[in-house]
Amino acid sequence: MFRIVRRAAIAATLMLVTAAASAQDRRQNRPGNFDFYVLSLSWSPSFCEASAEKGRAPREQCGGRPYSFVVHGLWPQYEKGFPEYCQNPAPRLDRTIVSSMLDLMPAPRLVFHEWDRHGVCSGLGPRGYFDVVRKARAQVKIPEPYIELARPLTVTPDEVEEAFVEANPGLTRTGIAVTCDSRRLHEVRICMSKDLRFRDCADIDRRACRRDRLVMPPMRGGTGPN
């Protein structure tokens, strides 16, 4: 008798999970059907240092140019979760568009990847999407201490978030998240509405780095974009 009841309970649970998944699937991965954007800014020196440790640092981004924060991507998001690869194959991305984005996204492979995985989910064409990427980046002011970083800097996630909040009126601590690896600051992720206004995003904020101290490796020298 116990086994019968247990099997019935398991079956009921599976039905609920399947129903919930089906409800999500009706919306999931439909181009243009999302709630907000996340602008992900990667601290390039951390990326290059970590990539070099694995023996695969891309020359375009990790050569001699002094990159600081670069655009990793502008990602359509749901309030929980995110769409990806909304069209397969993705509409063709012209190389002139790729070239036009290299000041913000320094590796062509990154531009192609971001379009295929995230850009098509915006519901915009290639030119329209990357225009929005550029506008989103222009909305964010990089705090002064991180513009020309000549020496390694030890920070806390809270310090970095607070610096961005102070530099960007309208941005709140629940609308930004710092990510990290085992010891380095990795990215700063900023939530924006579809019309590129700062907004809160509880799901992104919950997944922020929880380490006490992080290192920001220095830039390669010279002056980076701000």
Please identify what each model-predicted range represents.
Residues M1-I10:
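Bacterial N-terminal signal peptides that target proteins for export
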Residues M15:
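Short, surface-exposed polybasic-aromatic patches that bind anionic ligands, especially phosphate groups
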Residues A21-A23:
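Boundary at the C-terminal end of the N-terminal hydrophobic targeting segment
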Residues D25-S46:
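Short N-terminal segments immediately surrounding and downstream of signal-peptide cleavage
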Residues V38, A52-N226:
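Domain-level detector of nuclease and nuclease-like folds
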